[in-house]
Each structure stands twice: as C-alpha cells, then as structure tokens.
C-alpha cells in the first residue's frame, strides 16, 4: 500500500510519485488550497491538495485529525522562502494526486497539543503511542535491543531461551505464582530472573549465553520499576569478573556511541565502601559535585553530645556536606531540608554558614557554634575546603542513618540548587559489595543473591565471620542509576551449601528448593560469571526521561494494574474450580460491593 515513509522524504526524490499511508496530524484550509500534515511512525510531511484535483479535494475536505488515510502524490521541492527548518522533511512537500480514507476517527479522548493526565495516557495507550515523542522512544528501544543482539552475536554469545513457568526460589522479592491444573495444589512461579537456568547452561557447556527476557517481581513500584520488566541477561564461563566488566562496558560504550553519538570513556571503578563514604549511596551520581566528608575525629571531644556521642561510637558516624554558595539558603529552606532528612531517621540538621572564611571562628554563623572552639571550626573549614558564601550541613547519628540521610540530601541539593550537571554522562563500576547484610533482628541476608561467590576466601573462612566477607559482585552505574548488576557465581557444592547454612536454610530446605542445583554442582562445573542489565532503565536513560513507563509500550501503573485492559481481574469461577482454588478475599470484596449497592 505504500512506497515510502512520510519521514523519509527528501529532495533526492523530487519529481517521483510516492504512495504514503498514515494519519492526518493536522489539516488547514489556506487560500483555496488544503494543506495536510500527514504522519506515520517515521515522521511528518506536508501534503498540498489543489482544487483542480476535484475528487481528491472533495475527500480532503472531509478529513479530520487522526483519520487513517492512503495518499498518492508527487514529491516537489519547496521554494526557499517556504522551507520549514523545524521539520526533517521541511524542504519538500507532496502534491496530492490520489486520496483514500481508510478509516475515520471519532474525536480523540486525548489532546495531543496539551498535557494529558497519566491515567488518560495509560487508558488510551494506543493513542498516546501515536505521539511522535512516544513513538521515538519505542523506536529507540527497538534499536537498543537490536544493537545488543548484534553485539553479543558478534562476540560468540548464544541466544538461548529459559523457562517462564518455573520453581519458586528466594531471590529477594515476592513471586508471581501460577496454579497448576494438572498438579492440583501446586504452583509455578514466574521467574524473577533466569539466574539458576543460566548457571545450569554454563554447566551444560554453553560458555557464552545471553537472552533479552521478561522477568517478574511482585514488589512495591516506583518510577524506575515495573512488575514485569525486560532484562538483558548475560552469563559466561572461564571469564573473570574483570573480563565480564570489560566486555559489557564495551557493549554499553558502543551502544551510547551508535545511538547517541556520545563517548562515555573508560568507566572508573569504585569500591562499595568508598561509594557509601563519599556519596552516601552504592549508586552514586557523579554529575553532582557534592560529597560527604567525615569529621568525627574533629568533633569527638566537643561538649555537645549530639556530635561527640556518635563520634565516639564505633557504630556511629559524623559527616558533613559543604554546599558551595549555600550560605544564601534561608532559614525556611534549611527547615525544609531538616524535615527531609527526618524521612531517613535523622533527628536534625545542624548547619554552619561561612560568611567570611578569612575571619575563621568569627566569620561563621551557626546555632551550634557555641559548642565549638576556634580550633574545631578551623579544622572543619580546612577539612571541607569551605569558602566564603558556603554552608556546611552536619549529620550525626548511626552510620546507616547518616549515610542514608546525607546521601539523599546530597541528591536533593544537587537538584534544587542546579549543581548536578545534566549535560554530561558519568558512568562507573561499583565493586566489592558485602556478601551479606543484617536485617533489624540481626539475621543475615544475601546482599545480591545466594549464588554470588565470596571474594578471596574459602567456605571454612566464610563460616567463621560471614558478616565481614565481601562478594565478588559488581554493579554498573550511570548518572545515579544502577543499570546492571552481576557477580562471579559459586561453582562449588560445598561453598554453596555453606552460604545456604549462613542464610539459615537448613539441609532439608536446601534439597527441596535447590537440590537440582547442588546436584549439578557435583559434575565438573566450570567457573562462571555474568551480569544482567535492565533494558527498560537503559532505554530510559538513552531517551532522557526519568520514568520507565515512558519507554514501555504497555506499562502498568504504580498499583501494578493495566488501565487499558483492566488487568488484573477476577477469574471465572469455573476456572478456579478446575484449579481447585477458592478465593476468600475476592468473596469478601464482592460482598462489600453487593452491600454497597
């Protein structure tokens, strides 16, 4: 039906007859001529309908926005004075010689010229996706996926599918469960990742595997998470952590170069502890120049328990952020930041304005200055490299509270005061994560997942002091977003059992949940390592948006529902009966609805 896309037309096609299919983006009557901006997925071109073409002109008079049409016409170059430099096709127009209305359109429930509510956009997503902004994002996503496949194919990786109906295993989030009709009372789980299957593929001899795969996690949502998401899953045998990072970094740098013409350069490598200490986060945004500076040694002897208490506690921390030009912050603004850090458990936010750096103690203004002497203030100014016009913000509490509160405050200050340079890209690797982390009750949990190898110790050494062990894990971070994470895997059955034991998984449970893995590890398992990227998050960054819903064709809401199809919905009672399932909650809700009526 078509010979060209609207957005591909240019001067090289002058005089040629083309056939186009698409939608009416806009129609205008000017001086007896009808002008149509015709749109398809590749762009917009201007069509001119002359009244001398009577049949075409009569049909063109009937056109309204979003009519689906087919058009035949001749490409002609616009006069220089009429060139539209805002359009990719602005040097040409089409003189219509034929027109067919394929389908008419009712008045749209969305207004493409205004901001529509998120709810309306998701409910009528098929219309929202017609907008060039959205269309461009979905096309860029397709290009990113195509690039990944091409790169990995060229580097001897095999695209291998893994099961979607599988066994529930503890990976940190709740599983989506699928009931079995054949095995009544039993359930499959939708995979949170293909983790165990890709490890089994390494044991099968497929030493370079990849898959662009759907994964599912029943967890609380936020702007960069969805219940179903797409992962670029990669696993290798006989490669070190450094080699995995090298090849995946090469993939990302070449992707950015091809799709954005941006040179990311070589990624710096930062240890987990350094990232927390300097930036208050294991995914630091290095575009933001603010850093956390430890000052416990300076404040440990002051006569102010708020500072000296944590400064002398091995589980405490006292740190500051120096904000260039921050002395201009009003008391109201400081109070707002005090409320903000309270979200993270901080009990307050002490501050010190540097009104005159050369004057030392006499040149600072602070509600806590009376507790500090000249030497302490001088040391603080030197340690933070403060200058006239700056403000120093203090955090003093447990290590966790100070790190989280000041880390979040750092990001907020960078945004509010426009200190974060959004014109640049700052990637890095974060490595040497702790193997385990404690919950509020002192129990250990795997920081990544229980199949991650510890760094440089034996199973016996790990069992002695597991809380002190680091893992051979690594995350790729770009502009404050974790875009990929991976690790060297455990390839020894004894080590795997040791990790399970530390996590409180008893031998019987090990066999029931992971017996197949422990068995497979007995048969010449190669050393293996891998990494998984979040495709949605990568494309979100490539597109310059801050919400992954913008780069998914049909996303869910933050309540994990689809406004387009009204999923999830109540199941047919006959289907539930066939599955031997009784849904008590649904009955209660139904009773409430009936009583309300």
Curated annotation (Swiss-Prot):
GO molecular function: aspartate-tRNA ligase activity; ATP binding; nucleic acid binding
Transmembrane domains' residue ranges: none
Residues annotated as binding L-aspartate: 171, 217, 448, 489
PROSITE patterns: AA_TRNA_LIGASE_II
Family to which the UniProt record says this protein belongs: Belongs to the class-II aminoacyl-tRNA synthetase family. Type 1 subfamily.
Classification via NCBIfam families: aspS_bact, PRK00476.1
Protein name: Aspartate--tRNA ligase
Native organism: Photobacterium profundum (strain SS9)
Gene that produces this protein: aspS
């Amino acid at each position: 039906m078509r010979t060209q896309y609207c957005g591909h037309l240019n001067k090289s096609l002058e005089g040629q007859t083309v056939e186009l299919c698409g939608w009416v983006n806009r129609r205008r009557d000017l001086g007896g001529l009808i002008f149509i901006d015709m749109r398809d997925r590749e762009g917009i071109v201007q069509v001119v309908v002359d009244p001398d073409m009577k049949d075409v002109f009569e049909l063109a008079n009937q056109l309204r926005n979003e009519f689906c049409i087919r058009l035949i016409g001749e490409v002609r170059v616009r006069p220089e004075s009429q060139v539209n430099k805002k359009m990719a096709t602005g040097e040409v127009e089409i003189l219509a010689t034929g027109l067919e209305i394929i389908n008419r359109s009712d008045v749209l429930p969305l207004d493409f010229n205004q901001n529509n509510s998120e709810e309306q956009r998701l409910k009528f997503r098929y219309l929202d996706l017609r907008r060039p902004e959205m269309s461009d994002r979905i096309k860029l996503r397709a290009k990113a996926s195509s690039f990944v496949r091409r790169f990995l194919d060229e580097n001897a990786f095999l695209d291998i599918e893994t099961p979607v109906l599988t066994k529930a295993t503890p990976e940190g989030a709740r599983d989506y469960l699928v009931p079995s009709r054949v095995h009544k009372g039993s359930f499959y789980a939708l995979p949170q990742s293909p983790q165990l299957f890709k490890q089994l593929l390494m044991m099968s001899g497929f030493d370079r595997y990849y898959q662009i795969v759907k994964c599912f996690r029943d967890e609380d949502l936020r702007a960069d998470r969805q219940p179903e998401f797409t992962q670029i899953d990669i696993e290798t045998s006989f490669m070190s952590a450094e080699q995995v990072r090298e090849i995946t970094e090469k993939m990302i740098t070449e992707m950015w170069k091809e799709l954005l013409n941006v040179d990311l350069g070589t990624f710096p490598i930062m240890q987990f502890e350094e990232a927390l200490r300097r930036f208050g986060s294991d995914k630091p945004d290095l575009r933001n120049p603010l850093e956390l500076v430890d000052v416990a040694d300076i404040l440990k002897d002051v006569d102010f328990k708020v500072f000296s208490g944590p400064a002398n506690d091995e589980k405490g921390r006292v740190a500051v952020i120096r904000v260039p030009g921050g002395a201009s912050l009003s008391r109201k603004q400081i109070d707002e930041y005090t409320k903000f850090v309270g979200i993270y458990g901080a009990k307050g936010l002490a501050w010190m304005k540097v009104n005159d750096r050369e004057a030392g103690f006499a040149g600072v203004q602070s509600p806590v200055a009376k507790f500090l002497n000249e030497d302490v203030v001088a040391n603080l100014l030197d340690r933070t490299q403060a200058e006239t016009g700056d403000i120093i913000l203090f955090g003093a509490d447990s290590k966790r509270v100070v790190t989280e509160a000041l880390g979040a405050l750092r990001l907020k200050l960078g945004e509010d005061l426009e200190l974060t340079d959004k014109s640049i890209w700052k990637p890095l690797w974060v490595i040497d994560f702790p193997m385990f982390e404690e919950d509020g009750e002192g129990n250990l949990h795997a920081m990544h997942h229980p199949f991650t190898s510890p760094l440089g110790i034996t199973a016996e050494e790990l069992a002695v002091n597991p809380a002190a062990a680091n893992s051979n894990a690594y995350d790729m971070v770009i502009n404050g977003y974790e875009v990929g994470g991976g690790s060297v895997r455990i390839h020894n059955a004894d080590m795997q059992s040791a990790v399970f034991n530390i996590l409180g998984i008893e031998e019987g449970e090990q066999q029931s949940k992971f017996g197949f893995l422990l068995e497979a590890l007995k048969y010449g398992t190669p050393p293996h390592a891998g990494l998984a990227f979040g495709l949605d998050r990568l494309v979100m960054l490539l597109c310059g948006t801050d919400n992954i819903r913008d780069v998914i064709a049909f996303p869910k809401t933050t309540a994990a529902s689809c406004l387009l199809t009204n999923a999830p919905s109540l199941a047919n009672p006959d289907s539930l009966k066939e599955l031997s399932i009784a849904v008590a909650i649904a009955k209660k809700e139904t009773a409430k609805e009936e009583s309300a009526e």
